[in-house]
C-alpha cells in the first residue's frame, strides 16, 4: 500500500512539473471540451418566435462559431405540454427546454439536490385568453362539471396553474383545485381546432396567440378571463430552462445561446413583417401576414429575456403546496448570467 501511495505521489509531482513548464512557456492548456451537439425544444405558436428565429437563421451556430466552439450541430424539436418537456430535459434528451414558469418551477423544486434545473432567460410576455363557446358562461364562477377545458397539461402547465389561480381568486385558496377535474390535456393547435369545430366535449380553451384571436372570430365564442387579469398584470408566458449540469459543463455554449436569443428578439422587434412570414412558413399556417403582424404590434405582446411576474407563480405554487421550497426572489431559480436584468 505504501508503494502505491508513493507511486501516486511521484506521478502527481511529475504532472505538476509538466504544468509549470506549459505555463512558463505560455503554451495552451487543454480545456474540457464542450458539447458538439445541442438539442433545443420549442413549443407551438407565436410565444416561441425567438426560438423559431434562432432555428431559421441558424443563430446559435453563428454565435458558437464566434465563441471559438467551431461548427456545432443544433437540433430543434417541437414538443407540446410542460410535462413532456420536463421529462425530456431530465432524461438528457434536451439541452434547453421551453415552457411556462410553472413547469420550470416544478423542476427547480424537484431537482434542487440533483441536476438542479434553473431558468436560462424569459422568452415572451403576453396574455392568454380563456375562451368558451358555452353561452351560459360569463365568468369563471359559472363553470360547471358539464364544461371541459383544454390546457397544455393537466395540473402542471401554465394554463392549468392559471386556472387554479382563477379558482383561488374567485372562491378562496382552499378551492384552488375546483376546476382541475374539468381540464383535459391538449396541444394548442388541437385544442383550438376542437373549440372552433363545435364538436366534441371541449367547449372551453385556455388559449394563446395566434389561436385565441382566431377563436374569437367564430360566432358564439367569447372570453371568460385573461391571464393578465388573473395575475394582476403582465407576466412571462414562455421561458427557457436547462440543468445546472449542462450549464456548468458548457459555459461558452450557454453564452452563445444567450447571444443567439438576444439577436433573435432584436430581429423580431426590427422586422415584424419578415418575421411574420417566417412564422407562417415554419408552421404551415394559413393565416394572413397582416394578422400575425397585428399580434406582434400589440403592446401587450413583448419578446424579452427579462422575467416578468414569475414570483407570483412561485408564491401561489408554494401557498398551495405545489412547491416544497419557497424562493426568496426570481434570481433563486434563474442562472446568474441574466440576474442583472430588472426581473420579477
Spans of model-derived segments:
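Short, surface-exposed acidic
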Residues: 69-75, 174-181, 283-295, 324-330
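Secondary-structure end/capping motifs
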Residues: 247-324
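Short, glycine-/small- and polar/acidic-enriched structural segments
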Residues: 34-176, 181-185, 199, 203-209, ...
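Conserved C-terminal helix/tail region of periplasmic/extracytoplasmic solute-binding proteins
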Residues: 317-344
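Solvent-exposed, polar/charged alpha-helical surfaces in well-ordered, non-transmembrane soluble domains
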Residues: 62, 83, 87, 91, ...
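Bacterial N-terminal signal peptides that target proteins for export
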Residues: 2-19
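Bacterial N-terminal signal peptides
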Residues: 16-28
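Pocket-lining segment of extracytoplasmic ligand-binding domains
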Residues: 172, 180, 189-280
Amino acid at each position: 500500500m505504501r508503494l502505491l501511495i508513493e507511486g501516486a505521489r511521484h506521478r502527481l509531482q511529475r504532472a505538476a512539473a509538466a504544468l509549470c513548464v506549459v505555463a512558463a512557456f505560455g503554451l495552451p492548456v487543454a480545456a474540457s471540451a464542450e458539447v458538439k451537439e445541442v438539442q433545443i425544444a420549442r413549443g407551438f405558436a407565436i410565444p416561441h418566435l425567438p426560438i423559431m428565429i434562432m432555428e431559421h437563421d441558424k443563430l446559435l451556430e453563428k454565435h458558437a462559431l464566434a465563441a471559438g466552439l467551431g461548427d456545432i450541430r443544433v437540433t430543434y424539436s417541437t414538443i407540446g405540454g410542460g410535462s413532456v418537456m420536463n421529462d425530456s430535459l431530465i432524461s438528457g434528451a434536451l439541452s434547453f427546454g421551453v415552457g411556462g414558469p410553472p413547469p420550470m418551477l416544478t423542476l427547480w423544486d424537484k431537482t434542487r439536490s440533483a441536476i438542479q434545473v434553473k431558468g436560462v432567460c424569459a422568452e415572451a410576455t403576453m396574455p392568454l385568453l380563456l375562451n368558451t363557446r358555452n353561452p351560459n358562461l360569463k365568468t369563471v364562477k359559472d363553470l360547471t362539471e358539464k364544461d371541459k377545458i383544454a390546457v397544455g397539461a393537466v395540473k402542471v402547465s401554465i394554463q392549468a396553474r392559471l386556472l387554479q389561480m382563477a379558482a383561488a381568486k374567485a372562491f378562496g385558496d382552499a378551492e384552488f383545485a375546483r376546476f382541475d377535474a374539468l381540464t383535459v390535456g391538449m396541444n394548442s393547435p388541437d385544442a383550438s381546432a376542437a373549440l372552433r369545430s363545435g364538436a366534441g366535449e371541449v367547449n372551453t380553451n385556455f388559449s394563446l396567440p395566434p389561436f385565441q384571436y382566431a377563436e374569437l372570430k367564430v360566432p358564439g365564442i367569447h372570453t371568460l378571463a385573461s391571464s393578465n387579469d388573473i395575475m394582476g398584470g403582465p407576466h412571462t408566458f414562455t421561458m427557457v430552462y436547462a440543468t445546472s449540469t449542462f450549464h456548468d459543463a458548457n459555459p461558452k455554449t450557454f453564452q452563445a445561446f444567450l447571444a443567439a436569443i438576444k439577436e433573435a428578439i432584436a430581429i423580431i422587434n426590427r422586422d415584424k413583417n419578415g418575421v411574420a412570414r417566417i412564422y407562417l412558413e415554419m408552421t404551415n399556417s394559413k393565416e394572413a401576414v397582416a394578422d400575425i403582424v397585428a399580434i406582434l404590434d400589440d403592446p401587450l405582446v413583448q419578446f424579452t429575456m427579462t422575467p416578468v411576474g414569475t414570483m407570483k407563480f412561485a408564491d401561489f405554487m408554494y401557498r398551495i403546496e405545489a412547491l416544497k421550497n419557497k424562493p426568496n426572489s426570481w434570481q433563486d431559480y434563474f442562472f446568474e448570467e441574466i440576474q442583472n436584468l430588472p426581473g420579477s
